[in-house]
Each structure stands twice: as structure tokens, then as C-alpha cells.
């Protein structure tokens, strides 16, 4: 209860990794997520090149973009580029509305005692059916590491 009440005071910095397989939706998705997260990275699996408009937008906003052949490659690789405490992975076509934002903060509050540990990463999967969310937090300190899994059906 106390940790939950104080959660806003210790809100960690959060990176959003947008998994992009739809260039047409990319800029609007980034604009939406930039309001919520401290850092945005694009993991691009779209084969076609970005338009000049998208390239200009990414450069102007200092958004890093990395190219992948498939989604399976993304998670472990992208974490080396993350500068924040927690990392959230979102599909580019999903709607991250207020309801989902509240869910995300509720998940964070469950792990509030882990926030000060070292090497925290956090993944939040927003799946296509918009009903099922899987959260996975990993933290390690010294030689000890723990895995925390949360599954939410909404």
C-alpha cells in the first residue's frame, strides 16, 4: 500500500521501443508514445526504406532506429541501446490509450521494490486482440538474478 502510494515519486525512466511493420502509421504512433515515455526507439522490420518525411522526423526528434529481419531478434538486442531503467515494447499499430497506460503503471507498482536494483528491464506486450497483456520484469544485482512474470487478462 505504501509503495503504491509513493509510486509516482519513484517513477523510473521508461524507454518505449516501437516495433514497426507499418511505415504509414509510424509517425503518428511515435507522437502518441512520446507524450508518455522518456525515450523512444524504433525497431524496424519493414523491408521498404523510410520516406524522407519519416527520416526527417526521426532525426529531428533524436529517435534511434535499428533494422531487424523479424520480431524474434528484437528484444535481447535492443536492450543494449536503452538508456532508461525500464523498457516497454509496443506494436506500432496498437492503440496505447489511457486504459492501457493505467495498466502499465499498475504493473510498475507491483515491482516497486525492484526499481532500485541494477540492470532493470521491463517488457510490456500489447497484443493484437487488445485483451491480453503479458508483462515480464527482469532484474539482477551482483550475481543474483530474478525473473518476475505477470500475466493479465483484461
PLM features per residue range, with description:
Residues 14-16, 38-42, 63, 116-122:
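Hydrophobic beta-strand segments of well-ordered beta-sheets in folded domains
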Residues 11, 82-85:
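Active-site acidic short loop of glycosyltransferases
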Residues 21-25, 47, 71:
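Short beta->alpha connector loops
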Residues 8, 35, 56, 80-81:
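Solvent-exposed polar/charged
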Residues 1-32:
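N-proximal low-complexity "stem/linker" segments adjacent to membrane-targeting elements
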Residues 45, 83, 90-92:
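Active-site acidic Asp-centered loop
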Residues 1-3, 72-79, 87, 94-154:
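Catalytic-site signature of metal-activated, phosphate-bearing donor transferases
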Residues 30-69:
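Acidic donor-binding segment of Leloir-type glycosyltransferases
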Amino acid at each position: 500500500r505504501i509503495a503504491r502510494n509513493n509510486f509516482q515519486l519513484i517513477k523510473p525512466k521508461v524507454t518505449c521501443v516501437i516495433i514497426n511493420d507499418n511505415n504509414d502509421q509510424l509517425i503518428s504512433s511515435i507522437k502518441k508514445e512520446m507524450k508518455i515515455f522518456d525515450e523512444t526507439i524504433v525497431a524496424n522490420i519493414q523491408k521498404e526504406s523510410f520516406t524522407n518525411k519519416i527520416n526527417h522526423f526521426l532525426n529531428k526528434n533524436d529517435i534511434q532506429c535499428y533494422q531487424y529481419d523479424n520480431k524474434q531478434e528484437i528484444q535481447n538486442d535492443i536492450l543494449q541501446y536503452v538508456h532508461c531503467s525500464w523498457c516497454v515494447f509496443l506494436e506500432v499499430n496498437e492503440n496505447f490509450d489511457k486504459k492501457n497506460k493505467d495498466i502499465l503503471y499498475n504493473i510498475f507498482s507491483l515491482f516497486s521494490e525492484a526499481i532500485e536494483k541494477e540492470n532493470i528491464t521491463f517488457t510490456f506486450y500489447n497484443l493484437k486482440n487488445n485483451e491480453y497483456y503479458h508483462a515480464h520484469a527482469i532484474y539482477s544485482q551482483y550475481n543474483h538474478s530474478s525473473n518476475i512474470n505477470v500475466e493479465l487478462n483484461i
